[in-house]
Curated annotation (Swiss-Prot):
Species for this entry: Schizosaccharomyces pombe (strain 972 / ATCC 24843) (Fission yeast)
Function comment: Promotes unequal transmission of alleles from the parental zygote to progeny spores by acting as poison/antidote system where the poison and antidote proteins are produced from the same locus; the poison component is trans-acting and targets all spores within an ascus whereas the antidote component is spore-specific, leading to poisoning of all progeny that do not inherit the allele.
Pfam families: WTF
One annotated GO biological process: meiotic drive
Quaternary state and interactors: Homomer. Forms protein aggregates. The two isoforms can interact with each other and with themselves. High sequence similarity is required for their interaction.
Gene for this chain: wtf13
Family: Belongs to the WTF family.
Keywords assigned by UniProt, alphabetized: Cytoplasm, Endoplasmic reticulum, Membrane, Toxin, Transmembrane, Transmembrane helix, Vacuole
Biased composition (Basic and acidic residues): 1-29
Name this protein carries in UniProt: Meiotic driver wtf13
Gene Ontology cellular-component terms listed: ascus epiplasm; cytoplasm; endoplasmic reticulum membrane; vacuolar membrane
Length: 388
C-alpha cells in the first residue's frame, strides 16, 4: 500500500503567504510592525486611517475654547462698527480729560512761574496724545486686561473672605471650647476647695471657731476701711459690726457640711452679741442726749473700735464656751453682790477697828482713873499699913 502525504497548510495560510509576498508598487513595502509596544501600526490598516483622520481634524480645528465675552464683543463690533468706534473715541477722550484735570489739580500751573507753565504744557501736550493713542488703538487689549484683572481680584477677594470666615469660625470654635474647659476646670477646682475646707472644718471644731473669728476680723477691718473716709458715728459702727458678723455667718453658710447645731449655736451667739452692742449704743446715746454732749470724729472711732473689740471678744468667748453670754447676767449679778458684800465687810471691819480703838481708849481712861484713886488715901492709914 502506498502512503500518500497531504499538505497540512490550509487555503487561508496560502492566501496570507501570497499577500505577504506581494508588494504594492504604489504604496511601497510595509513597515515592520512592532507588536511589543504597539506604537507602530500598519500604515494601510483601518485603525491608521482613522487616527490620521482624527489628527487632521484636530489640527485644523480651534485649539482654544472661545470666550463668551470676546465673542459678544466681536459680534457687537461686526454688527455696529460706527457705535463701537464712537465708544472707543468717547472712552479715550474721557481718559485724556481725567489725566488733564488730575494733573491740573495736583500741579496748579497758575501759581507757577513761566518756566513751570511751559514745562506743564509740554508734559501735558506729550502725555495726553500718548494716553489717547494707547487707549484708542489698544482698546481691546487693555479692556481684556482690565476685565481679567477685575475677575482675578474678585476671585482673590472671594477666596480671602472664604478663608477668613473659615478661620474666624475655627477661632470661635476653639475659643468656645477653651472657655468651656476653663469654666469646667475652675468649677471643679472650686468644688474641690470647698469640699476640702468643709471637711477640714467639720473634722476640727476648734479650727472652725478660729477660722470664723479670723474671717470676721478681716471683714471688719475691710468695712472699717471703707467707712473711714466718711463721718463714722455709732449707727455706722453698729452697722459695720453687724455686717461683719453677718458676712462671717454667710461664709459659714456656704460650707454646707457644717452640722446644724453649730449653725444654731452661731446664730444664737450672733443675736446675743448684737443685743449687748445695742444696749451699749442705746445707753451711750441716752447719756449723750441727757448731758447734751457731742462726740467728735475721734470719739466715734474710739466707740466703734470698742464695739469691735467687745463684739469679737463676746463672739469668740461664746463659741469657745457655749452659754457664756446667757450666764453673763447672773455672773454680773453675783459679781456685783460679791463686790457689795466685800464693801460691807470692809466697812464692818473698819467699824470693828474703830470699836477696838474705843475699847483701848476706855482701858487707858480706867487706868488713869485707878491711879487717881490711889492718890486719895490718908497718911495715918498708910503708916498703919506699913507697920502691919
Amino acid at each position: 500500500m502506498k502512503n500518500k502525504d497531504y499538505p497540512l497548510r490550509s487555503s487561508m495560510d496560502e492566501l496570507s503567504t501570497k499577500n505577504d509576498n506581494e508588494i504594492d508598487l504604489e504604496k511601497g513595502p510595509l513597515p515592520e510592525y512592532n507588536s511589543e509596544d504597539g506604537s507602530t501600526l500598519p500604515p494601510y490598516s483601518e485603525i491608521w486611517k482613522y487616527i490620521k483622520t482624527v489628527s487632521e481634524d484636530s489640527s485644523t480645528g480651534p485649539t482654544e475654547i472661545a470666550n463668551p465675552n470676546v465673542e459678544r464683543r466681536q459680534e457687537f463690533k461686526d454688527s455696529h462698527p460706527n457705535i463701537y468706534s464712537l465708544l472707543r473715541l468717547l472712552i479715550s477722550v474721557l481718559a485724556v480729560i481725567v489725566v488733564f484735570f488730575t494733573a491740573w489739580v495736583c500741579v496748579n500751573p497758575l501759581e507757577k512761574s513761566i518756566f513751570g507753565k511751559v514745562a506743564f504744557s509740554v508734559t501735558i501736550g506729550i502725555t495726553c496724545p500718548i494716553v489717547f493713542i494707547a487707549i484708542f488703538c489698544f482698546f481691546e487689549t487693555w479692556t481684556q486686561a482690565v476685565a481679567q484683572c477685575i475677575k482675578v481680584t474678585v476671585i482673590f477677594l472671594a477666596q480671602c473672605v472664604k478663608v477668613t470666615a473659615i478661620s474666624l469660625a475655627q477661632c470661635v470654635k476653639v475659643t468656645a471650647v477653651f472657655l468651656a474647659k476653663c469654666v469646667k476646670v475652675t468649677a471643679v477646682f472650686l468644688a474641690k476647695c470647698v469640699k476640702v475646707i468643709a471637711v477640714g472644718l467639720y473634722n476640727s471644731k476648734k479650727d472652725l471657731v478660729v477660722t470664723i473669728w479670723l474671717a470676721w476680723v478681716v471683714i471688719c477691718f475691710i468695712l472699717f476701711g471703707c467707712v473711714k473716709d466718711g463721718r463714722l458715728n455709732l449707727n455706722k459702727a453698729l452697722i459695720c459690726s453687724t455686717c461683719s458678723i453677718s458676712a462671717a455667718l454667710f461664709f459659714i453658710l456656704l460650707l454646707v457640711c457644717i452640722p446644724i447645731w453649730t449653725l444654731k449655736h452661731m446664730l444664737f451667739g450672733l443675736f446675743q452679741v448684737l443685743g449687748v452692742q445695742s444696749c451699749v449704743v442705746i445707753v451711750t446715746k441716752g447719756l449723750m442726749y441727757l448731758f447734751d454732749k457731742h462726740i467728735d470724729a475721734t470719739g466715734y472711732e474710739i466707740e466703734a473700735s470698742s464695739l469691735f473689740v467687745i463684739g469679737n471678744f463676746l463672739f469668740f468667748y461664746e463659741m469657745e464656751r457655749p452659754g457664756a453670754l446667757k450666764r453673763m447676767p447672773k455672773f454680773i449679778g453675783n459679781g456685783i453682790a460679791s463686790f457689795l458684800g466685800g464693801l460691807g465687810n470692809a466697812f464692818g471691819g473698819i467699824g470693828n477697828a474703830f470699836g477696838g480703838i474705843g475699847n483701848a481708849i476706855g482701858r487707858i481712861g480706867n487706868a488713869f482713873r485707878g491711879a487717881n484713886d490711889n492718890n486719895d488715901i490718908p497718911l495715918g492709914e498708910m503708916d498703919v499699913e506699913s507697920e502691919v
